[in-house]
Amino acid sequence: MPGARVAAHLDALGPLVSYVQPPLLPSMFYVGLFFVNVLILYYAFLMEYIVLNVGLVFLPEDLDQALVDLGVLSDPGSGLYDADSELDVFDGYLE
């Protein structure tokens, strides 16, 4: 049978197309996601550095007055946040 001989001869030659590895899309997606997260962290720390170190140059001499101008403090003489003022509110309640 000549067809069987041809088929055996073709089987001996091996596959006509070499094996192609499937693409690495899922793993490459996670590699890309990792680098995007690294870039986000880099820019977050860069912004923090700029705000904390470069921004300190532009702070005024009178920090209390600057906080009043921003609306953080209502009275320049009050100073920064005082934790003892909260206790005065509860003095009558606890007795």
UniProtKB/Swiss-Prot annotation:
TM spans (from-to): none
Record-linked InterPro entries: Dexamethasone-induced
Pfam family, one: Dexa_ind
Family the UniProt entry places it in: Belongs to the DEXI family.
Name under which the protein is recorded: Dexamethasone-induced protein
